[in-house]
């Protein structure tokens, strides 16, 4: 998932993995807190 900010990652991470936390790293989302 490409991104410019961490806020863009929260919904995709919840939908794809169910993880509540997300960070935008190197223009891609990293999901964690699963």
Curated annotation (Swiss-Prot):
Q: Which Pfam families match?
A: Toxin_2
What's the domain of life for this entry? Eukaryota
Q: Name one GO molecular function term.
A: toxin activity
Please give the function described in this protein's UniProt entry: Binds to voltage-gated potassium channels Kv1.3/KCNA3 (IC(50)=0.48 uM) and Kv1.1/KCNA1 (IC(50)=6.7 uM) and inhibits channel activity.
Q: Which residues form the signal peptide?
A: none
Where would you find this protein in the cell? Secreted
- Which residues get modified to Cysteine amide? 34
Report the domain remarks.
Has the structural arrangement of an alpha-helix connected to antiparallel beta-sheets by disulfide bonds (CS-alpha/beta).
Q: What keywords would UniProt list here?
A: Amidation, Disulfide bond, Ion channel impairing toxin, Potassium channel impairing toxin, Secreted, Toxin, Voltage-gated potassium channel impairing toxin
Q: Known post-translational modifications? A: Contains 4 disulfide bonds.
What's the name of the protein? Potassium channel toxin alpha-KTx 6 hetlaxin
To which species is this protein native?
Heterometrus laoticus (Thai giant scorpion)
What S-S linkages are listed for this chain? 3-24, 9-29, 13-31, 19-34
The free-text tissue note of the record is: Expressed by the venom gland.
UniProt feature coiled coil, ranges: none
Family according to the record: Belongs to the short scorpion toxin superfamily. Potassium channel inhibitor family. Alpha-KTx 06 subfamily.
A GO cellular component annotated for this chain's UniProt record is: extracellular region
